[in-house]
Swiss-Prot record:
Protein name: Molt-inhibiting hormone
Keyword Signal among record annotations: yes
Bilayer-crossing regions: none
Gene name of the encoded protein: MIH
Signal peptide: 1-35
Length: 113
């Protein structure tokens, strides 16, 4: 039979374990969200995340349309400055936005080696 002190201690351990597990899961989610907007190939990403998200959306749409493994990575390669990105713009039927997208890619990739 458990005493009242043992019962209280057991309850505290359960709560502590729950808090630790939730904190770990939250931390994992934050790291994944932060990693999503990090692209080492785009030197001007900081301060231009809104542009990055607009351009990246093309790659996400393209990947969802064709369901080809690695399609989004190919599209993002060299900070979107590649023929796969242009192909995805046309495949997602956004050809009329190509000039704006190319300008945004130029801003994101300015200073690239």
């Amino acid at each position: 039979m458990m005493s009242r002190a043992n019962s209280r201690f057991s309850c505290q351990r359960t709560w502590l374990l729950s808090v630790v597990v939730l904190a770990a899961l939250w931390s994992f989610g934050v790291h994944r969200a932060a990693a999503r907007v990090i692209n080492d190939e785009c030197p001007n990403l900081i301060g231009n995340r809104d542009l990055y998200k607009k351009v990246e959306w093309i790659c996400e749409d393209c990947s969802n349309i064709f369901r080809k493994t690695g399609m989004a990575s190919l599209c993002r390669r060299n900070c979107f400055f590649n023929e796969d990105f242009v192909w995805c713009v046309h495949a997602t039927e956004r050809s009329e936005e190509l000039r704006d997208l190319e300008e945004w890619v130029g801003i994101l990739g300015a200073g690239r080696d």
